[in-house]
Amino acid sequence: VTSLYQVVSLLFVNNGASWSSFDSTPGVKWREASPQPNPDSNSPESSNFREGTLLLDGFGMVDVPDGNQGAEAGVKKINEGESGLTLNGDAQNVHSIAVKKFYVSPEYADVVRRQLPVASTVRLIAGDCGGNIAGGPDTQTKFYEIGIKDHQLFLEAYIDDGEGSRGPGYTTFLFTKVNPDKRIKELQCKEL
């Protein structure tokens, strides 16, 4: 069982996924001991956050920026599956899980399937979005419905190719229990 599966399966809890239920998730290293106030949010459902790291299965070693600036800048080797993890929620419960990995992996469904049990389903529900912040068409953002046992989750996946930052780019996977209809309409995506 992968670390990502163990984290997203906690969203299935009937009475809500309490912050403390994530405390001892195998394979997750938390940066904070508890949720922190989110000053960037104006939504009650993301008024708190907690960050950590986990390793996605099925990736090898790659070069990434070492974090230094200017003449000191260099690269270091890490497993491409090393990913940042952010939980977002209200004061009591987690409502969404974001996973951000270095490097562009546009085959979103394949990456997610490697992390979930064999019986899981990953079904594309929207893509070919009409607009992004830069004003052009967004061919990269995709939305999925994920079925695991008798439970349903939704996934928004997108990439940033690193253009302009000279970095390797990254891929973000955002898991929620709530259907992202509003977000799909906002991005003018074609529903399937």
Where do the language-model regions lie?
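Short aromatic loop motif centered on NTY/YTY
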Residues: 126-163
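N-terminal leader/targeting segments
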Residues: 1-88
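Short, flexible beta-strand-to-coil junctions
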Residues: 89-93, 102-106, 149-150, 160-163, ...
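Long, charged/polar, surface-exposed segments that mediate recognition or autoinhibition
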Residues: 58-141
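Short, surface-exposed linear segments at secondary-structure transitions and domain or protein termini
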Residues: 164-169
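Hydrophobic beta-strand residues in large extracellular and virion-surface proteins
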Residues: 22, 87, 97, 144-146, ...
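Short, low-complexity, Pro/Ser/Thr/Gly-rich segments in the mature regions of secreted, periplasmic
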Residues: 171-192
